[in-house]
Design a protein with these regions (language model features):
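Phosphate-/nucleic-acid-contacting segments
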Residues: 166-191
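N-terminal positioning helix adjacent to the helix-turn-helix/winged-helix DNA-binding module
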Residues: 151, 155-158, 162, 188
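Residues that recognize and position ribonucleotide moieties
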Residues: 21, 38, 57, 79, ...
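Cyclic nucleotide-binding regulatory module and flanking cytosolic helices
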Residues: 1-42, 91-92
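Transmembrane helical bundles of ABC transporter permease domains
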Residues: 144-147, 151
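Cyclic-nucleotide recognition modules
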Residues: 27, 79-137, 141
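Amphipathic, well-packed alpha-helical segments that form the structural scaffold of globular domains
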Residues: 32, 36, 137, 141, ...
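Cyclic nucleotide-binding regulatory domains
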Residues: 19, 44-107
């Protein structure tokens, strides 16, 4: 059974997220007041492509693997959502179904805000609209950067950029002096 309360570490991950920490205390309070906690084991399905958008989600612990399935049936990992990151809002805004699958990568804790509560918070806080616009603008900039990289960088350079991103997000010092880092996320080579 899910523990309905975030651990201290999970709460800290949510509160220290770059976007969430920029919100006013009253908006953060209302979001957290409406959120429910769900815990998943490695590989647990969080949301499936084609599902109606019922929840806005934040990763509090572990990671969420966002993927798609190719025509041949192969799972393709698009990204990993790290603790402190919110997602799933696009489908709530446009009313379309989920576009990708989301799975727990390792033991994962998420926060979920029901679609109805999300809309109530939007109605109560005009600041929330502006914050969501900033969040979407940052995502669009990231997407343009990815498209540019795909069209201008060789595979080696794209791989190097991805490794740097993973170290920034999941890096763990592997030597006592911190001179080496390892990625604290179990990945298969093809991912």
């Amino acid at each position: 059974m899910d523990d309905p309360i975030l651990t201290i570490e999970e709460r800290e991950a949510i509160n220290s997220g770059r976007w969430f920490s920029s919100l006013s205390p009253s908006l953060r309070h209302d979001i957290l007041r409406c959120a429910c906690v769900k815990r998943f084991k490695d590989g647990g399905l969080i949301a499936a492509r084609g599902d109606p958008p019922e929840e806005w989600i934040a990763c509090a612990r572990g990671a969420v693997r966002v993927s798609s399935t190719s025509i041949s049936g192969k799972q393709i990992t698009l990204t990993y959502v790290e603790p402190g990151i919110w997602f799933g809002d696009v489908a709530i805004f446009d009313g379309d179904r989920r576009t990708h699958d989301a799975y727990a990568h390792g033991d994962t804790t998420i926060l979920c805000v029901a679609k109805a509560d999300f809309k109530k918070i939007l109605a109560a806080h005009t600041e929330f609209y502006e914050a969501m616009l900033r969040l979407h603008a940052r995502r669009i900039r990231q997407l343009y950067g990815l498209v540019e990289d795909l069209n201008t960088l060789p595979l080696r350079a794209r791989l190097a950029k991805q490794l740097v991103h993973l170290v920034r997000s999941y890096g763990i010092p592997s030597l006592s002096d911190g001179s080496e880092m390892r990625i604290g996320l179990q990945l298969a080579q093809e991912e």
